[in-house]
Amino acid sequence: VPDAWKRPTRARVLRIRDRLREVYGIPRMAPHGRPLDELILTVLSQSTNDRNRDVAFLRLRERFATPGEPIDYAAMLAAPVSEVEVAIRPGGISKVKSARIQAILAAIAGTEPPGAASTPGAAAGSPPTGDALSLEWMRDAPVEKSRTYLCALPGVGRKTAACVLLFSFGLPDIPVDTHVSRVGTRLGLFRPGAPFEELHDQMLAITPPGEELEFHVNLLRHGRRTCHSRTPACAECALARMCPSRGAFASRP
């Protein structure tokens, strides 16, 4: 990417979006409305692949949910951390993730959503209830307020918060993972050297309103299928003609 970086124009962003749309289509994914599930899924996804993440989440369901019912997060919080650790072992670094999951649940149970009325489970000495362990209030709350709340939870950053808001409720936020970051940087969408957390603000600023899901999913797909980390397939890239980084990897073995 050239040193003299300039914020991409709307026309350039739309050309990239349209070309990605030609290759990958428009993803269809209705918001699932389960923000706490999404939050825990994102924790489980850290340092592993989608398959291992999904197996770990399924194991959590088997341990802490009655068939056909949602996960009992109050029971998960009350359980010994070793039970959570055993359940999520297929997802890797289970000791770290199990402690983080319980810390997040404890924080939700013990803190109030911004502007919310008193929550029974948050009272001193009162065990958390299903209602206390809920993020449903975010459905109608200002996005910035919900994002700030999520990012204050233990181990939760902008990407995790964006996953919860976008995938659970379809709210205007956009996760920037390693694939989106890599593709966006090579295309010149991001300021070179920008801190990872800052990329979310840059991504939101350039994404056409209402197209957050499409842009995230298609950039991610392109990163996985073509714009690989070490050996991107530039010769086969649908975006090659509009990529300032094309040819930069030709000399690599």
Give names to the regions the model predicted.
Residues 2-252:
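Catalytic cores of DNA base-excision repair glycosylases
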